């Protein structure tokens, strides 16, 4: 079990990052709500991790705080929810927003998430309500606020930002036409890919 990883952030390709730890690059997938809080490439960061072993792959999922990882693991206990869907859920809304949606029986909000139909949303509300009774948010390793386009790599080309945003949204479960439609509403050449993804997810949710 790999509980956390600390290393130099060498690549950011939403929703995946690469951390260099003594010459070894670890590919880690993050919910976009965590991705927004990352520092620029080249800085050292520490991520709480969840390790998944499958027959065809070994995957690492990363989080800013232990409570986010705990919520991810609770989601995995729900019937029909695997790591990909859990990642999409926590990309579409913050941990606090998800907990609020469950506590308020807000099925309408949940079905807007990619891969979540009405039955899955109802199951999430029923199965997660009791599990979340003792859930408490914890302090993340970094107190960085979500970074805007000024805090990211200014060298990113607008066309690349749009392409990366579409790719990231598709990896989270949205169809290409859904991603395109959402990006049309928020696109600006001044936005980098992370800002575009954040704004598009607001449109989609």
Swiss-Prot record:
Listed GO MF terms: ATP binding; four-way junction DNA binding; four-way junction helicase activity
Region: Domain III, residue numbers: 157-205
Flexible linker, as annotated region: 144-156
Domain II: annotated span: 65-143
Database matches in InterPro entries: DNA_helicase_Holl-junc_RuvA_I (IPR013849), Hlx-hairpin-Hlx_DNA-bd_motif (IPR003583), NA-bd_OB-fold (IPR012340), RuvA (IPR000085), RuvA_2-like (IPR010994), RuvA_C (IPR011114), RuvA_C_sf (IPR036267)
Role this protein plays: The RuvA-RuvB-RuvC complex processes Holliday junction (HJ) DNA during genetic recombination and DNA repair, while the RuvA-RuvB complex plays an important role in the rescue of blocked DNA replication forks via replication fork reversal (RFR). RuvA specifically binds to HJ cruciform DNA, conferring on it an open structure. The RuvB hexamer acts as an ATP-dependent pump, pulling dsDNA into and through the RuvAB complex. HJ branch migration allows RuvC to scan DNA until it finds its consensus sequence, where it cleaves and resolves the cruciform DNA.
HAMAP family attached to this UniProt entry: DNA_HJ_migration_RuvA (MF_00031)
Family (UniProt): Belongs to the RuvA family.
Name listed for the protein in its UniProt record: Holliday junction branch migration complex subunit RuvA
Organism: Idiomarina loihiensis (strain ATCC BAA-735 / DSM 15497 / L2-TR)
Gene name as annotated: ruvA
